[in-house]
Amino acid sequence: RYMHHTIKDKNQSIWIAQREGRAKDSNDRTQESVLKMLAMGGEGDIIDRLIEMNILPLAISYEYDPCDYLKAQEFQLKRDIPDYKKTQEDDLKNMQTGLFGPKGRVHFQVASCINEELEKLDRSLSKPELFSQISALIDRRIHANYRMYPGNYIAHDYLSGTQAFAGHYTAEEKKHFTDYIDQQLARIELPNKDIPFLREKMLLMYANPLTNYLATRTDNPK
């Protein structure tokens, strides 16, 4: 209700994250629980209540993720130790690294309001299906507005074993990115480092935004 009051009555904007933290593999998806919370206030049905919010998806694109090596490390720990749980110290290290670590170029892109698309949805759908479709709509808007960097194309080519995106980066940029990945891998503190596994996980973090971006090209949302 506070958010509806702030937006509708006070005519002020509010920023809210689409999920709790970034996805470890950079395959970010909107949590339906966030939409359910937004639809708790306002008047009318779910669609009416969300239209009141005038939702504008925001895409944030980082050239580098300073936590990439920590995420890769956690992937191996969870693979090797089924009941592995991060400690409070681990969480604090992740927060500190994420806040103060180098991110390279950062781009913010605000997409257009989704109200027109919300109006087109079938209001007779069940709540789970409706929230699922709205989440997918927001995800498409965010993914379509990502800013791609050389590392995204290089990582995708490495994983596919092709040079499909070679036109998007130079030999110098490829060497720089490869050296960066090697440096980050060297920071991982594990007694039994599985380098091929860790490298693949890190490359996926940079390839997935491009994969999601390409998936929106047929829809061409703005």
Question: For the regions a protein language model found, what residue spans apply to each?
Answer:
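Membrane-interfacial terminal anchoring regions of lipid-handling membrane enzymes
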Residues: 1-14, 21-222
